[in-house]
């Protein structure tokens, strides 16, 4: 059992126990020692003087332990079962949204992920004021919930869940706690209090420009352009969506770059600015061969969706150029 008063993790493993008992060990020290032990069985011996010996092969550690009575009790959460979902599906949902969680402690509700369950689907949402990530999957929920789970908890859940759709994880929740139960692990966590943004209100309706493009090709183009962008030189990418192609430009004190690739563009031609990292995060987490970008206006959030289906929706805010953003109707090119 591990518990830091905000999150607790309980796991059970098979062992040849010669004498039952309880001790408390430094978690980080124990983890580092075990990870560096030679392959094979590990023996743990605790003495009455508070010394604990951990041995594997010829490697042997002796460390100070603490009394189990000093360890805080896990709370009785009273959480009610809400839904069951394949572990691989939940892990994928978490991994595809965590990048957009806010780091701004002044808005604590946005430092976690919104879990929203309806009778037939689970939605996970993250946002930081510059981008928004929404992933939905079909489920059969016993109870509808709307809770905010700390990003630290989500990281641990993702790390511990098997990437296997044959195994399942049971999610239980109430107004204060959430509990994830799967084969081998139980993870409980306090929830974040506060009101999560009504994200539906920030999603643009319709679009003036729709672009279907190859995800890998777009990522590689942005990565090349990003070579002249540094933490000190954060000039935006200037990206033009025109008939049949996407043109990426950037200029900093290190130099300038122009690159392009073919794409299926419909509607008005547009040139718009992007933070390279924010756009890359959305594209890398799309995990699909082609994406569709929908642009409603020069200063409106840009939607990134799968070319087919609707299992995710990412929003990326554009960056205003020092001069004005350009938004024009198509015109013949030389």
Q: Residues of each region from the PLM?
A:
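Structural preference for solvent-exposed beta-strand-turn elements
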Residues: 1-329
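A short, hydrophobic C-terminal helix/tail in secreted or cell-surface proteins
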Residues: 330-334
